[in-house]
């Protein structure tokens, strides 16, 4: 039976009139559809019965779709809505005119280096925006990259890959195609971070330059072995004419250890841009400029002015020595009662109403999709049906104008983000990074007494002696990897990281009955990359401690601390620790990084909210002014 005969073209699915089958794969089908209630044309993905009935997949898909729907970046094809009709799960997405990068490479072969860099730069912009919002893609590959005729690139299928287990993909026979781009840590029990997306992007860069993925094999086992232990291929050795500088770019992007990779997708894209010759850098800039100008909407005409005027974690006793981690029983609680802690950041109420056709439908983030070209293809959903129209075919559609204010705001947002992306890519010579902060400047970065008192809500906190070495106190933590989430500047935490110097201060009110305690430290590393890598590693360990209780043994005394959820992601992370049986005594840990300096702060008291985060931010500001 042909694709056309076996499709649901012409039928209704809830409020959607399915007009054209765009693609088919192991997870389901993609249709061009008209939303008959809201009168716009979209892409609708219908999941197979196997996936729709899988409770794990259903919950993951809903969660990831809600997160991915928040992304507002020109190179991201957003999810507008999700839900189910008669037990079948679906996703509604913007319809985009384009063909997937995999088809382009198979039909035309490798891209020129400038064109490859232009496309990687756009996808890096999408990934960095997602990572900043705490969203990982997990399935970056040519099939999930759409290219328009003017080389404007989109990254699709946010949330789908992460909703699907690798075992499920294996059962569907699609794992080998996906595993060509999987980072080594995805084949182990190690935590998978956003740097897995950077690894995959480096694999895509390799394929754009050479026409082939880095590793090719007939079995998933061979692919896994190559990613884990195989040498990283050199594009210049595979295809003559590729600048040798790309070998180093791909090697770092595909580093076996996540901490050895680029700190962001944008860093990888910038390195790829710098690997081009000067004429090719200009060519890549021209491609980016042309794609932006042809795809992003023009600014709205100015509105005439109105004719009428507008209507108007520390112990409660000082540690001995001063750098001893917190652990001593605090003094009695003050007479006031601490206020309730605020709810988790980003918590959103559920939808207030849902149409009868989709009882579990997800919230719509906006009143309708941003008007865009009308063809969607790819996303790992298989090739278009045989005999279908040209991928550049235009299909008339009904329009539903956006309100003027919302439209103008969207246009401004897209233009600003687009302009930033162009500027980064087309500058002829990159701005030189700042010189590393010298060790003798570390003490000047710490907050003085008045600054610490202002943040902590005190008036009498005073600093102790300067700290110039890591704390090596004989402290035992039941979960050793959580020691850094509990205490500042710990020798076991920093040992072997390559740091070069530390400077810190402990501040509190005089005497034994202090109500506030702060340990602030700044740690110098040889390079900014090493400092960022340390913070990323710390973030991974802290997240593994969230919700857990640890037992601390310090000088023959035992204490128990419970970790809340970690907030933020590198470059800044925070977590609150509560001491058991200490009448509300809490500490907030904060860690951040600027240039080659790691900022390490612990702020303790009875009314802890984000004091450590504020202190860290103020220190970062000082580092950036150096």
Swiss-Prot record:
InterPro entries tied to this protein: Kinase-like_dom_sf, PknH-like_Extracell, PknH-like_Extracell_sf, Prot_kinase_dom, Protein_kinase_ATP_BS, Ser/Thr_kinase_AS
PROSITE patterns (UniProt xref): PROTEIN_KINASE_ATP, PROTEIN_KINASE_DOM, PROTEIN_KINASE_ST
Residues annotated with Phosphothreonine modification: 170
Region ranges (Disordered): 292-396
Disruption phenotype: Deletion causes hypervirulence during the chronic phase of infection in BALB/c mice. Mutant displays increased resistance to acidified nitrite stress. Does not affect sensitivity to ethambutol.
Keywords recorded for this protein, A-Z: ATP-binding, Cell membrane, Disulfide bond, Kinase, Membrane, Nucleotide-binding, Phosphoprotein, Serine/threonine-protein kinase, Stress response, Transferase, Transmembrane, Transmembrane helix
Protein's name in the database: Serine/threonine-protein kinase PknH
Originating organism: Mycobacterium tuberculosis (strain ATCC 25618 / H37Rv)
Gene behind this protein: pknH
